[in-house]
């Protein structure tokens, strides 16, 4: 079942794509080359249309700082371990994008001069204007900030039009669709409705950044082939969170 206003959407010129690290592992620890290659092919097909694409990747296929903390590790140290995991994912995606013939740059919030550029928003925007895909690694470079928050902050700083949240579900539901077959998918919803209904779109800090700065969020299913292109083109997929 579906719910929400189904307004006509228009395509986007510059987007921020947030990818969960767990997807890169294919459900296991490490990197699944087949998954990363598939994602790279989807991004490459969109980049060839002239759309400007920035990417933030999580590191959950290697480390999750909060989970490591529960096992007794220092939270600061475990968060930095997670940041290093994101960089490994960034380099893997960069390699597969270059195999597709797409010019690509990795920028990190922690200085890693031998493998990536430092995060410089003006340089990132210039790369995008030249048709390069830009991948941001190492989160915010500080503990206690998620990669969802990184994606929201970077999207605002480099003037993206929308934050595309790639998930393993079709969008935002009023209940868990895996356990409730009658769960309703929202096609479009406002940030206020998300709060009132207690729905989960992104972590609280990321969601607040987007809401306060009127940054639309599109939650969609990455596992459906071609959905990145559909999302960038503004087709009616997933859930659009917009005032």
Swiss-Prot record:
It is found in: Cytoplasm. HAMAP family: PyrH_B. Pathway: Pyrimidine metabolism; CTP biosynthesis via de novo pathway; UDP from UMP (UMPK route): step 1/1. It catalyses: UMP + ATP = UDP + ADP. Belongs to the UMP kinase family. This is Uridylate kinase. It is an enzyme of class 2 (transferase). Inhibited by UTP. NCBIfam families: pyrH_bact. The keyword ATP-binding applies. Signal peptide: none annotated.
